[in-house]
Design a protein with these regions (language model features):
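Conserved "HGTGT" condensation-loop signature of ketosynthase/thiolase-family condensing enzymes
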Residues: 1-150, 162-168, 177-181, 189-320
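Active-site histidine-anchored catalytic micro-motif
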Residues: 155
């Protein structure tokens, strides 16, 4: 609790384009096979994507693959501008002149090879580090990228919390996004298949993969939200019980409800982020903050949980 940091500003963005149903093609046999396996593992019969840069002139079966990557890069710029402008002027000037670190996150690590007709100039922006954002925030200290699949954002938050509590930096900026590349989305699901028992879904029989980008500015300065990252817990739920707090009024999670219920001895309100908002890879946990602002919650504590493939979980708490 003493190491808790404050989320001074956040911005999230998703495409304005509609959802497109994925349709397998014989031109890409491996992708079609992965799609079939993913549907079986998730007990669904279809998969819809919402992506930045969908092209009106693309062939129907290729519309979710042949997207314009520049729309994704542009969205990163926009959320960074919004997050910066949301700060009070004094804080904004302080950020530009203080010790500031920049962390870039995404779900896949090196995924530019899956982009349609990408230039060498923009390849490093997606795969390595968006230098335009580093310049925007006038960062001349530490910059890095975390490639932790769906855990990337929480790993970046843990690093940010350490930086701030050790007084190494005054501000830590975390920017990143999720590219809903069909083949990677299918194979990621196949790593951790769901149980055979079907679970109720908001849209029965359909998986939703929605691209989102986000920018989050953390500091020790008091903000609207206070955030504290907890430790990792293995499948032994007794360890988790020692860190459970009675003032938690809402538990948001990304994954199967059955994978987290063994960790709770007392009834608690659950929010399935993927069911409510669609899956956005490493950005999904940040949707719990969106939920707080969307419903104008005040005076409570929320725990956001991300189960892993081995029966364990990572989490962070948010006071609002």
């Amino acid at each position: 609790m003493d190491d808790a940091m404050h989320l001074l500003s956040l911005s999230l963005m998703e495409p304005e384009a509609p959802l497109f149903l994925y349709s397998p093609s014989w031109l890409n046999v491996w992708e079609a096979h992965s799609y079939d396996i993913a549907l079986k593992n998730t007990d669904t019969n279809s998969w819809a994507f919402k992506r930045f840069g969908t092209r009106a002139d693309a062939y129907d079966k290729e519309v979710v693959n042949r997207t314009n990557y520049m729309a994704y890069i542009s969205a990163l710029e926009k959320v960074s501008d919004v997050a910066m402008q949301a700060l009070p002027q004094k804080e904004r000037m302080l950020l530009m002149k203080s010790r500031t670190a920049f962390i870039y996150v995404d779900s896949w690590g090196e995924a530019a090879g899956f982009e349609y007709d990408i230039s060498t100039l923009h390849l490093s922006t997606i795969d390595t580090l968006p230098k335009n954002l580093v310049k925007k925030f006038s960062v001349d200290n530490v910059t890095c990228k975390i490639r932790g699949e769906k855990n990337a954002l929480i790993q970046a938050m843990r690093l940010a919390q350490d930086y701030l509590s050790w007084d190494i930096f005054d501000f830590v900026i975390v920017c990143g996004g999720y590219r809903a590349i069909p083949l990677l989305a299918f194979t990621a699901t196949n790593i951790n298949p769901r149980s055979k028992m079907k679970e109720s879904r908001k849209i029965p029989g359909m998986n939703l993969s929605i691209e989102r980008v986000g920018c989050f500015i953390f500091s020790q300065t008091t903000g609207d939200l206070k955030v504290n990252c907890g430790p990792y817990f293995s499948a032994d739920s007794s360890q988790y019980q020692k860190n459970y707090a009675s003032d938690i009024v809402l538990v948001a999670f990304s994954g199967r409800a059955s994978s987290i219920t063994p960790f709770f001895k007392h009834p608690v309100k659950l929010l399935d982020l993927e069911k409510k908002y669609g899956s956005s890879g490493c950005i999904t946990p940040a949707l719990s903050w969106h939920h707080i602002f969307q419903h104008a919650f005040k005076g409570g504590r929320m725990r956001t949980i991300l189960p892993d493939h081995n029966g364990g979980l990572t989490y962070f708490d948010t006071w609002y």
